[in-house]
C-alpha cells in the first residue's frame, strides 16, 4: 500500500510586498505641482523650499519647477527643494 507519512508544518514561507520606496524624481528634472519626489520611511530626506511632507513622510512638490537636492547644516541633512519654473520668458 502506497502511503505517505504526515509531513511537518513549517512556520516560514511568508514575505511582505515591496513598498516601492525611494526617490521618484531626480535632480534638475522638471515636475508639476503635487508630484511625489521621494517616498520614504522617516525623514531620510527633509522638505526644503516649495516641498511639502505628507503624514507618511512622502515629499511632494508644492509648485511647478525643477528638483534640487542639497546637503545642509552640521548634521549634513539631505534637503529637497523645488526651484519654481517661470516659463520660457523668465529663464
From Swiss-Prot:
Stated name of the protein: Large ribosomal subunit protein bL27
Residues making up the signal peptide according to the UniProt record: none
Keywords attached to this entry: Ribonucleoprotein, Ribosomal protein
Molecular function in Gene Ontology: structural constituent of ribosome
Organism ancestry: Bacteria, Pseudomonadati, Pseudomonadota, Betaproteobacteria, Neisseriales
Taxonomic source organism: Chromobacterium violaceum (strain ATCC 12472 / DSM 30191 / JCM 1249 / CCUG 213 / NBRC 12614 / NCIMB 9131 / NCTC 9757 / MK)
Example GO BP: translation
HAMAP family listed in its UniProt record: Ribosomal_bL27 (MF_00539)
Cross-referenced Gene3D superfamilies: 2.40.50.100
Domain of life: Bacteria
Pfam families listed in its UniProt record: Ribosomal_L27
Family the UniProt entry places it in: Belongs to the bacterial ribosomal protein bL27 family.
UniProt keyword annotation of Ribosomal protein present: yes
Any one of the GO CC terms: cytosolic large ribosomal subunit
UniProt KW Ribosomal protein keyword: yes
Amino acid at each position: 500500500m502506497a502511503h505517505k507519512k504526515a509531513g511537518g508544518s513549517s512556520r516560514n514561507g511568508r514575505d511582505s510586498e515591496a513598498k516601492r520606496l525611494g526617490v521618484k524624481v531626480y535632480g534638475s528634472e522638471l515636475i508639476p505641482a503635487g508630484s511625489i519626489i521621494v517616498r520614504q520611511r522617516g525623514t531620510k530626506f527633509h522638505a526644503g523650499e516649495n516641498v511639502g511632507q505628507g503624514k507618511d513622510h512622502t515629499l511632494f512638490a508644492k509648485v511647478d519647477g525643477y528638483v534640487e537636492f542639497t546637503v545642509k547644516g552640521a548634521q549634513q541633512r539631505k534637503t529637497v527643494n523645488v526651484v519654481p519654473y517661470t516659463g520660457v520668458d523668465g529663464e
